[in-house]
Amino acid sequence: MAKKVAICTLLYSRDYLPGALTLAYQLQKLLKHAVVEDEITLCLLIEKKLFEDEFKPQEIALIRSLFKEIIIIEPLKDQEKSIEKNKANLELLKRPELSHTLLKARLWELVQFDQVLFLDADTLPLNKDFFEILRLYPEQTRFQIAAVPDIGWPDMFNTGVLLLIPDLDMATSLQDFLIKTVSIDGADQGIFNQFFNPICNYSKEVLHKVSPLMEWIRLPFTYNVTMPNYGYQSSPAMNFFQQHIRLIHFIGTFKPWSRNTTDYDDHYYQLWRSTQRELYSECHLSNYFTHLQLGNIETETNFYHEPPCLQDLLNHGTRENQKHVDLDITSVDRNASQKSTAEKHDIEKPTSKPQSAFKFDWESTDYLDRVQRAFPKPDT
């Protein structure tokens, strides 16, 4: 029987918007040619404050056109205390923004789905074979998390690609554990390993209070090949397994959309940029990004600068309907078993009688058509 599967990513900073959009676009392309038995829903989890305060209407319209469901998430209980408690370990990574990745603990609350496949916004699936991941472990339980070993410490898993079974009891246990425990790395990867991975939890009595059944299922590395891997990468292995790589994960501070130097002239970085250009071209956005690293990868600047919002750029167009977008956020009706989750999430979907010039009908309208109607080609 077909499962209801959510393929999710998390947006906790507008800096990752280019990654989230490109990821969604790539997933849509690949799903068109993949043989998938499950019912797939592309979801974006986004922090409530970020969604309400930092995105403009046209940016939201583009997000809505690429994701079937936008799930507005609240901060975790005592999240600020957890961030402060983990500050020292997080400083070792020199990545303070990763404190917000603790929000991934909300994934287990998505009980309207049978299974959740989580992908970081800085990942890029390469081919339709990537979706075979959904068939690898048909008997996965709520106590198991499937993930790829981390290249920096293979006894731990990398949280850029996660396969899990949503469960409210598990969500509560994980979030309680998160509040009480200092993460190995100050972020989600450490705490998830300490919760699910017995190797990382030497306090057995703490682990057993949750469940003795906790298990990390090791996925093949080809489902989450991290780059750059200076000092780690095995060139012979990359050459041997190249045709079998399913997904690339651009780890570290600099992303394909944030830097353009010869140091990052790798094939996979170029592939990501090519995919981004394709997205903007098909959405008729290319003309609006001629001076930005966000859309014009050939810029001579080496470092990413915060671009003007999409609204500012799109308002330079001649179409009046580019200037006004009415967005009504409503809650999706859920059955009784999902009401407890609904209290924690606001699910955005189109209203039955949209007031804007754009109509988003996921079931009957091709996603590309929706994008092109939301962002019509500028008059020349």
Swiss-Prot record:
It catalyses: L-tyrosyl-[glycogenin] + UDP-alpha-D-glucose = alpha-D-glucosyl-L-tyrosyl-[glycogenin] + UDP + H(+); [1,4-alpha-D-glucosyl](n)-L-tyrosyl-[glycogenin] + UDP-alpha-D-glucose = [1,4-alpha-D-glucosyl](n+1)-L-tyrosyl-[glycogenin] + UDP + H(+). It is found in: Cytoplasm; Vacuole. The keyword Cytoplasm applies. GO terms for biological process: glycogen biosynthetic process. The keyword Metal-binding applies. Mn(2+) binds at D120, D122, H249. It is an enzyme of class 2 (transferase). Its EC number is 2.4.1.186. Disulfide bonds: none annotated. Glycans are attached at Y230, Y232, Y367. Residues 331-357 are annotated as: Disordered. Self-glucosylating initiator of glycogen synthesis. It catalyzes the formation of a short alpha (1,4)-glucosyl chain covalently attached via a glucose 1-O-tyrosyl linkage to internal tyrosine residues and these chains act as primers for the elongation reaction catalyzed by glycogen synthase. Capable of transferring glucosyl residues to unbound acceptors such as free oligoglucans or oligoglucan derivatives. Belongs to the glycosyltransferase 8 family. Glycogenin subfamily. This is Glycogenin-2.
